[in-house]
Amino acid sequence: MRIILLGAPGAGKGTQAQFIMQQYGIPQISTGDMLRAAVKAGTPLGLEAKKVMDAGQLVSDELIIGLVKERIAQDDCVKGFLLDGFPRTIPQADAMAANGIEIDHVIEIDVPDEEIVKRMSGRRVHSGSGRVYHVVFNPPKVEGKDDVTGEDLSIRPDDEESTVRKRLDIYHEQTKPLVEYYGNVAAQGKTQYNKFDGTQSVAAVSEQLAKVIG
């Protein structure tokens, strides 16, 4: 079961990724975690990546693909894997195909931009404990105050509306073209592509996912 999960930041990919991992017993592979693990393990590719990152440069697609191949050859990927946050661009998707990395399911969690802005910019955090609230979906008892300590809540820089909109712009520019790309791959019978309405409840999306993946 080799799965790619697509969707904008805040679409609920993380929640569904947890469900897929538990349901099917496959690991979630994020490029960030993979890079850190390879660097820590001191593999040849990990050392090469460390050199690039220490110089403040971006790790090349070629190197990332090498790390992906190395990672999916490990024992815990025997049943499959879930790729999260990769590929992000069409050249990366092409490179995966060229390296013989086949994908069974491409899953897109689709949520309109305005809904994502509402979800993310409404988050409030108590920095001392990490407790998270939401002004609409999970408000504190007293506006702007932590329920337990009564201390002020804050907005994380990542959740500022302007930051959320910038991240959405990058997603539409870089990653949205992958939707069309994998739609074409699916039309050729080389993978299955399914889009889910991420504005539904978490349970409803999980149930639909399970039906499609089988």
Swiss-Prot record:
Family per record: Belongs to the adenylate kinase family.
Reaction(s) this enzyme catalyzes, per UniProt: AMP + ATP = 2 ADP
Gene name of the record: adk
Residue numbers spanned by region NMP: 30-59
UniProt-listed Enzyme Commission number(s): 2.7.4.3
Sequence positions that bind AMP: T31, R36, Q57, L58, V59, G85, F86, P87, R88, Q92, R156, R167
Biological-process GO terms, alphabetical: AMP salvage
Comment block on domains: Consists of three domains, a large central CORE domain and two small peripheral domains, NMPbind and LID, which undergo movements during catalysis. The LID domain closes over the site of phosphoryl transfer upon ATP binding. Assembling and dissambling the active center during each catalytic cycle provides an effective means to prevent ATP hydrolysis.
Keywords on record: ATP-binding, Cytoplasm, Kinase, Nucleotide biosynthesis, Nucleotide-binding, Transferase
Superkingdom of origin organism: Bacteria
Subunit structure, interactors included: Monomer.
Protein name: Adenylate kinase
Region (LID): 122-159
Molecular function GO terms recorded: adenylate kinase activity; ATP binding
ATP-binding recorded as keyword: yes
Residues that, per the record, bind ATP: G10, A11, G12, K13, G14, T15, R123, V132, Y133, Q200
Record keyword Transferase present: yes
Pathway it works in: Purine metabolism; AMP biosynthesis via salvage pathway; AMP from ADP: step 1/1
InterPro entries recorded: Adenyl_kin_sub, Adenylat/UMP-CMP_kin, Adenylat_kinase_CS, Adenylate_kinase_lid-dom, P-loop_NTPase
Places the protein is found: Cytoplasm
Source organism of the structure: Shewanella denitrificans (strain OS217 / ATCC BAA-1090 / DSM 15013)
GO cellular component, one term: cytoplasm
